[in-house]
From Swiss-Prot:
<keyword id="KW-0573">Peptidoglycan synthesis</keyword>
<dbReference type="Pfam" id="PF02875">
    <property type="entry name" value="Mur_ligase_C"/>
</dbReference>
<feature type="binding site">
    <location>
        <begin position="108"/>
        <end position="114"/>
    </location>
    <ligand>
        <name>ATP</name>
    </ligand>
</feature>
<keyword id="KW-0067">ATP-binding</keyword>
<dbReference type="InterPro" id="IPR004101">
    <property type="entry name" value="Mur_ligase_C"/>
</dbReference>
<comment type="function">
    <text>Cell wall formation.</text>
</comment>
<dbReference type="GO" id="GO:0008360">
    <property type="term" value="P:regulation of cell shape"/>
</dbReference>
<keyword id="KW-0547">Nucleotide-binding</keyword>
<dbReference type="Pfam" id="PF08245">
    <property type="entry name" value="Mur_ligase_M"/>
</dbReference>
<dbReference type="InterPro" id="IPR000713">
    <property type="entry name" value="Mur_ligase_N"/>
</dbReference>
<comment type="similarity">
    <text>Belongs to the MurCDEF family.</text>
</comment>
<keyword id="KW-0133">Cell shape</keyword>
<keyword id="KW-0436">Ligase</keyword>
<dbReference type="InterPro" id="IPR005758">
    <property type="entry name" value="UDP-N-AcMur_Ala_ligase_MurC"/>
</dbReference>
<comment type="pathway">
    <text>Cell wall biogenesis; peptidoglycan biosynthesis.</text>
</comment>
<dbReference type="Pfam" id="PF01225">
    <property type="entry name" value="Mur_ligase"/>
</dbReference>
<dbReference type="GO" id="GO:0071555">
    <property type="term" value="P:cell wall organization"/>
</dbReference>
Length: 435
């Protein structure tokens, strides 16, 4: 048994990694800011201690895991170096852990978390599988053969991984504080592809992924006729989405998923192709796909009187469009209201017009103040800059969420990667107080 201390244990990758090590009978604790994050719920359930930052948290018998958001001059990291402790960056430790399993890395500019969650759900129902999902969920399963994990492209961290398989969902320009442009992102994915050991499952409808060269078999999935795994006859029903799958030109089977939207079908195709490559029984894969309840903060639904409230992590224009599409396919002619909080000034500045176009797909738009990050607390753009590009858009301030009551029988999409949940909770409290 080892003793681990996580610096930044509430991170979306750090929290599940801590859970995995805890499940493997290690002693695990960590430190972070006091502000509540959804990622700490699972830590609390497992009794993993969360401490305020303090150099005194570091002791001589620990292995230290350093979160990506924390620099080498953080007081706890400085103390760990003084004591001569072994210190791993998050991505370094994850890369070493994955080497002990048949590993599947899920990467892409969008859809990583949902696809990782879906693959983990399917595989763990068929054979022992450990997993790390970027919604704060992780589990280390005894006697696991497989390890399914989310692999982020930011700062090329995924180059620390050498997985057996990789699912690549798409390539898009994001993280403009690091990548110089789309070509830089494509280059990063190309580097990653060269490190995969057995096979790559990639979305063939993404023209950027079609450029990828690999030293292993490359299987494509999508809607286009050129794909190896292809979805046809896609139908939205009251209980989800059904579609036929063809493997090249041969009928493979009819599948049903609880989710809606083209992105949900693509995620399922990626999982179907991966499981076929690993020779997992098709009928069991079908059964598991039908019982997937989603991951945290990805179209997470609740009801409030006659309204549907959706909590979603969408923070890029393409993700916003996918969320609006899913709402329309599931709820038909009901009004779709977008409540959006931009995440980082750099991202908003880089994609200002694209955000405006995506948000305009909703019937009504409310904009919340920009959420900075640990790396960026201020910038040269304002929320009013975005408002001016969307006809009829409103600014939503804290304390003013009661205005959302005006949208009877609507679907309210609370979208963002910051603390948009606080706006939703405030609105829920306003309505409950009036009941």
């Amino acid at each position: 048994m080892n003793r681990y201390h996580f610096v930044g244990i509430k991170g979306t990758g750090m929290s599940p990694l801590a859970q995995i090590l805890f499940d493997m009978n290690n002693e695990v604790r960590g430190s972070d800011v006091e502000k509540a994050f959804f990622t700490e719920e699972a830590l609390n359930r497992k009794g993993i201690e969360i401490l305020p930052f303090d150099p005194e948290n570091i002791s001589e018998d620990q292995i230290v895991v350093q979160g990506n958001a924390f620099s080498d001059d953080h007081p706890e990291i400085v103390r760990a170096r003084e004591l001569g402790l072994t210190i791993y960056k998050y991505y370094e430790f994850l890369g070493e852990l994955a080497n002990h399993y048949t590993s599947v890395a899920i990467t892409g500019s969008h859809g990583k978390t949902s696809t990782t969650g879906l693959l983990a759900h399917v595989m763990r129902g068929i054979e022992p599988t450990s997993f790390l999902i970027g919604d704060g969920t992780g589990e280390g399963v005894a006697d696991s053969k497989n390890f399914v994990f989310e692999a982020c492209e930011y700062k090329r961290h995924f180059l620390y991984y050498r997985p057996d398989y990789a699912i690549m969902t798409n390539i898009d320009f994001d993280h403009s504080d690091y990548f110089s442009g789309l070509d830089d992102v494509i280059d990063a994915f190309q580097e990653m592809a060269k490190q995969v050991k057995k096979g790559i499952i990639a979305c063939g409808d993404d023209e950027n992924l079609q450029q990828i060269q690999a030293n292993v078999p490359l299987v494509y999935y999508g809607f286009g006729a050129h794909n190896d795994f292809r979805a046809e006859q896609v139908t939205s029903t009251e209980n989800g989405t059904t579609f036929d799958v063809f493997l090249r030109d041969d009928f493979y089977g009819t599948f049903r998923i609880p989710g809606y939207g083209d992105h949900s079908v693509l995620n399922a195709l990626a999982v179907i192709a991966t499981c076929d490559y690993e020779n997992l029984p098709k009928e069991l894969v079908k059964e598991r796909l039908e019982t997937f309840n989603g991951v945290k903060r990805r179209f997470s639904e609740s009801t409030l009187n006659d309204q549907v409230l959706v909590d979603d992590y969408a923070h890029h224009p393409r993700e916003i469009s996918a969320t609006v599409e899913a709402a329309r396919k599931k709820y038909g002619n009901r009004e779709v209201v977008a409540i959006f909080q931009p995440h980082t000034y750099t991202r908003l500045k880089s994609f200002m017009d694209d955000f405006a176009t995506a948000l305009a797909e909703a019937d009504t738009v409310y904009l919340c103040d920009i959420f900075g990050s640990a790396r960026e607390q201020e910038g040269t753009v304002t929320i009013e800059d975005l408002q001016s590009r969307i006809e009829g858009a409103h600014i939503l301030k804290r304390g003013g969420t009661g205005v959302l009551r005006n949208h009877a029988d609507a679907v309210l999409l609370f979208m963002g990667a910051g603390d948009i949940q606080t706006y939703q909770r405030e609105y829920e409290e306003v309505v409950k107080l009036e009941a």
